[in-house]
From Swiss-Prot:
Catalytic activity as recorded in UniProt: guanosine(527) in 16S rRNA + S-adenosyl-L-methionine = N(7)-methylguanosine(527) in 16S rRNA + S-adenosyl-L-homocysteine
Function: Specifically methylates the N7 position of guanine in position 527 of 16S rRNA.
Protein's gene: rsmG
Gene3D superfamilies for this protein: Vaccinia Virus protein VP39
Alphabetized GO MF terms: rRNA (guanine-N7-)-methyltransferase activity
Residues that, per the record, bind S-adenosyl-L-methionine: G61, L66, I112, E113, R126
UniProt-listed SUPFAM superfamilies: S-adenosyl-L-methionine-dependent methyltransferases
Top EC class, one word: transferase
Keyword Transferase part of the UniProt annotation: yes
Protein name per Swiss-Prot or TrEMBL: Ribosomal RNA small subunit methyltransferase G
Length: 193
């Protein structure tokens, strides 16, 4: 895929977010002017960090498609499933997949805990839940040999400490490209403590 095609798709996606956001609150209204500089840039940073990822990719709590749609645009070689229980947001994601011609992306419109195990090689989540709660979802849907890519805000260190009381895991942290206090957590070897 050419860089210009990817850039065009990202611009189209940003336009879709702006168009649909007033009706279904895909991203905070206060950050609508930061779609490219914050939301898409965060997701592109994840794609860069996970550039060697292979196999299936599951994005939990996809909402407006961050990072799921961006991963699908930049990594069309991956089979990507976006899990979103809100039917309206699921409709947005399906529309985005259609308009952006992303044949390897699909939407699972169910609650995370109601899905059969997905056994993902890669799993992402952004702004979904505190890490201690998120770990149960990750453990359910990530392959034992898989990697979780969790985008966390300013409290990520406290969340990691809390999660370590119930879980053991290998952790590599990557500073966010858009917020020096935020991080992308690369988690492998997840198991109960």
């Amino acid at each position: 895929m050419s860089v210009s095609r990817e850039t065009e798709r990202l611009a189209t996606y940003a336009g879709l977010l702006r168009k649909w956001n007033p009706a279904i609150n895909l991203i905070a209204a206060s950050t609508i002017d930061q779609i490219e500089a914050r939301h898409i840039a965060d997701s592109l940073h994840l794609v860069e960090i996970a550039k060697n990822a292979q196999g299936s990719w599951v994005d939990l709590g996809s909402g407006g498609g961050l990072p799921g749609i961006v991963v699908a645009i930049m990594r069309p070689d991956l089979e990507l499933s976006m899990v979103e229980s809100d039917q309206r947001k699921g409709a947005f994601l399906r529309n985005a997949i259609r308009e952006l011609a992303l044949p390897h992306a699909k939407v699972l419109c169910k609650r995370i805990e109601a899905l059969d195990r997905l056994d993902a090689a890669n799993l992402s989540a952004r702004a979904l839940a505190p890490l201690p709660q998120l770990m149960a979802y990750v453990e359910r849907h990530l392959s034992p040999s898989g990697t979780a890519w969790l985008m966390k805000g300013r409290n990520w260190q406290a969340e990691v400490s809390q999660a370590q009381s119930d879980w053991k895991f290998d952790l590599k942290t990557h500073q966010s490209a858009t917020d020096p206090d935020a991080a992308i957590l690369e988690i492998t070897g997840l198991r109960h403590a």
